[in-house]
Amino acid sequence: MSNDFVLSREIISVFEKNGVVLLKNMINNKWQRILIDAIEEDIKKPGPFFHAYNTEEGKGNFHGNMRLWEHYQGLKDYCINSTLPYFAAQLLNSNKINLFYDQLFVKEPETKNRIRWHNDQPYWPIRGWPVISFWTSLDPISKENGPMEFIRKSHKWGKWYQPENFAPGASKAYEKNPEFEKIPDIESNRDKYDIISFDMNPGDLLAFHALVVHGSAGNISKDRRRGYAVRYTGKDVIYCTEKGSHLDLRNPELKDGDLLDSKQYPVVWEKGENFL
């Protein structure tokens, strides 16, 4: 892999400290075109894990989907053959990277719904520290069209928050897990938290830890906002079907305690020793 894709010690340190880091100009035009084409195809003919939300005031529309890489060759190539697995290896300091799944978030103009504050890993049937997401937008991101917001350093709180539906009609209720906590009312007390967000351009990436608390505002602009995320895991992450995890992300090949290596969670990067 070219040295052009070696992340600086400063970038890795920011990720480890804050739980999120912005990577500028990392997705080239070829990959952006592939993402755009696949997203448009999914909007026209959604894949099997499509989900929509009831929007506020009856305006706008939210189009969501996941595990798209299993159905679109271009997205499979992006998830496996782009620089993302290599970035994950560096940020997680892992000698092995598995693809977990990918996810699409399209907010049409005037979709005012927030994506509620949450951390991701309680929704997922996996356990272990080295878990990361890379989120990119195919449209410029500003405060008007729903930027991602993060609470700095919240991945180190040691908190697993009970999964909840993101909007009415989004999905069935999540099972209650007695080991998880109810998330506090962050939105009504924003001044008590160290909240950060980022303006972005197409080609930029947000890398964030699976336990960092985050959400996003609605899209009050007149333009579409197309967000796409890919999730990866590092070494020693195991499969776990405790209450609360999303049923559509579970893997029939595995049993609790297994390493993730499987058709659904393939190994996409491997090296004989730790990257750093």
Which residues does each predicted region cover?
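Short, charged/polar surface micro-motifs in flexible loops or helix N-caps
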Residues: 84, 94, 109-111, 141-143, ...
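Active-site region of the double-stranded beta-helix
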Residues: 95-97, 121, 136-147, 153-156
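Short, conserved beta-strand element in jelly-roll/cupin
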Residues: 125-143, 199, 207, 231-234
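Non-heme Fe(II)-dependent double-stranded beta-helix
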Residues: 1-18, 24-117, 122-125, 243, ...
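A short beta-loop-beta micro-motif enriched in histidine and acidic residues
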Residues: 119-131, 193-194, 200, 223-224
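Double-stranded beta-helix
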Residues: 143-213
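Non-heme Fe(II)/2-oxoglutarate
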Residues: 45-57, 165-166, 202-207, 211-276
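Generic beta-strand structural signal
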Residues: 95-97, 101-102, 113-115, 130-136, ...
